[in-house]
Amino acid sequence: MKKFIITGLSVLLLVGCGAPQEKEDAQSKQEEQVVNASDENMVVFPEGAMSIGEGKVKVITPDGTSENGNIPTVFIKKDTLIQQVELELSNFQSDKETFVFVDQMYTDKHQVTSTTQTTVQLKEKALETGSHTITAVQYENNDPKGKVISFNQATFETKPAS
């Protein structure tokens, strides 16, 4: 009888000690996948590119738009972590993805029809007081490492809200 009890307790101890290891392995694999997923989304800003193509970028704020060279203002409250700004993309090639950058940092990509309205999230440095640039870029074969076929920008400024 004692042998059965000792054997039973030994089995329980072995099973109990083995389970957390599997859990840790699963957690580490999950973290690895998250890191790899963020690497895939890295798109480098095309340095030295000049305005090309017929696409147009328009920033829309409650203060106005960037149409006709105007520079609209976004008022940022003191403890804001994320601020959205409306963006209108037009006249881009509809068969290509349009990559959007804020201050040369990749934020998102869109499939643009004749005119597409969307929002861009301003974070961290883009919330600092000053002038900022939103850039829309299209690449040959939708490959960010390829040739730039459309490159257009719009400027806005941020100021602290009173």
Model-predicted regions and their roles:
Residues 146-162:
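Short beta-strand elements
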Residues 108-116:
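Short beta-strand segments within Ig-like beta-sandwich modules, predominantly Fibronectin type-III
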Residues 139-147:
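Short acidic/polar inter-strand loop motif in beta-rich domains
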Residues 123-131:
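Surface-exposed, short loops/turns at beta-strand junctions within beta-sandwich domains
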Residues 13-16:
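C-terminal motif of bacterial Sec signal peptides marking the signal peptidase cleavage site
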Residues 6, 18-75:
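N-terminal, intrinsically disordered, polar/charged segments of Gram-positive cell-envelope systems
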Residues 82-90:
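Short edge beta-strand/loop segments characteristic of extracellular beta-sandwich folds
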Residues 91-96:
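Short proline/glycine-enriched turn/loop motifs at strand-loop junctions of beta-rich domains
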